[in-house]
Amino acid sequence: MVIDANIYWFDEKIFHDDAYAEQFLAEVPRLYQTEGKMEILPNGRKQVVIEKPFGYANVNYVEGDYILENILADMDQSGIDVGILKLPCYHEWLSLELCKKFNDGMADFAKRSGGRLRGLGVVPPRASQAVKDEIDRCLNTLGFTGLQMVAHYGDHYLDDEQFAEFFEYINELGLTVYIHHNPVPVEFNQLYEYNNVRRSYGRNVDQGTAIMRELFSGFFDKFPNIKFVHSMLGGGFFAFKNLILPKKATKAEDVQRFQTDNGDIARHLEKNLFFEMSHAQPWGKDQLEAAVKILGADHIIYGSSYPVRKEWLTAGPDFVRALDISDSDKDMILTENAKRLYRL
């Protein structure tokens, strides 16, 4: 079995139902310099464009990219047995009403796939009884086995105290939560002007910031039963792991500049944090092999970000198989880690 843990889903009905489209676009948080608009491509297809900041496109949802039969055909071509449906960025601002609508849509999509596609529930990060009821519905009625969130909401990362009561409930349930990157980090003023800097590096800065805050704020001391799976390999976290866990100096120093008592942080990295690659080919062979060596194959999950680029799905598994890592490592990345964390 091969599992693609990152197949994007957007409700195609939005392209054909004016009232639904209006409702979706009305919730885009313009107070946070975010804009959403419907456009027509030269070939006649519609697309929803999300800009952040205004005038700078960051996410595109294109009509026809989310057709079940096409997704299954592409999965067949690439040898993908099971895909996990993810919402690309827009759940940062969805109301509970729209979350319910998207949860119903994902559940129906998964049901019609004959078990090939699975969903993760989405809710606003609030501790109201209505939100808890929707989480329970996702798990007990819709058949979802985890939740999906974004790295920050508004100007606040997930370690912010305003989310604590929400995570208390998630901790009680012992859930795996997939953490998708936002289009740009909270502080993006020097990142937005250039397209590749914004769309690639900006997302990694967002994830890296989120993980550092989760680790050093004591988040997992408070919520030890939660497992987070961060996209984009946690913003290339493998490059920084050793830097944030410095060893004690070999000789006595008058000034101690770094925290070296990092046992709890290392423990949370082992138990609570996992990394989905989002796509294999863009990272490259050397980077993925380094990530496996540093983070451990048991902490890395394969995903393709389909349909951003079709080839990331159709050629992604073979790219992982060609890495200079053990067969057991490849099996963990392509299958076993997702199966375990998402209870497939």
Predicted regions and their residues:
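Helix-coil boundary/capping segments in enzymes
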Residues: 1-344
